[in-house]
């Protein structure tokens, strides 16, 4: 994914069975730590919010007051500067990615995807996902935000 290359193309119809019994057991054991994981993600997301608030609507996820919001992703509205921002972050050894790809772009669907999707085309070049995981520390998020600011100014 990094660097704008597409490493996850779908070229034929098939099945995606990837979870093993071991993976399931690890997932079940992780449930014991779920509240701690959620709290850490909320804390890191709040750092992103406060560090990037000068850019207004840069962060796409919003939490309503009174909701128990736990972010899965930190998605930015790059305002058309996605590739430049990705390149800048990569130079600074910071991972970023579009994450979700449109189904009509996969090779397997090329015979069926001959339609125009102007709204999706407009959105596609404007979003980018930043790191958010439990191994991140607050100082990492602050560094990421500093680099985002440098790239978008």
Question: In which residue ranges do the predicted regions lie?
Answer:
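PLP-dependent aminotransferase class I/II
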Residues: 1-153
């Amino acid at each position: 994914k990094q660097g704008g290359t597409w490493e996850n193309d779908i070229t034929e119809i098939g099945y995606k069975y990837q979870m093993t019994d071991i993976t399931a057991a690890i997932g079940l054991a992780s449930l014991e730590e779920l509240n701690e994981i959620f709290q850490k993600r909320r804390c890191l997301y709040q750092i992103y919010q406060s560090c990037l608030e000068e850019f207004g609507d840069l962060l796409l996820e919003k939490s309503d007051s009174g909701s128990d919001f736990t972010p899965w992703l930190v998605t930015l509205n790059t305002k058309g500067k996605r590739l430049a921002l990705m390149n800048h972050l990569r130079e600074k050894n910071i991972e970023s990615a579009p994450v979700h790809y449109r189904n009509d772009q996969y090779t397997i669907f090329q015979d069926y995807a001959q339609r125009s999707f102007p709204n999706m085309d407009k959105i596609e070049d404007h979003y980018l996902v930043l790191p958010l995981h439990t191994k991140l520390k607050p100082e990492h998020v602050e560094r990421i935000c500093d680099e985002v600011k440098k790239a978008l100014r």
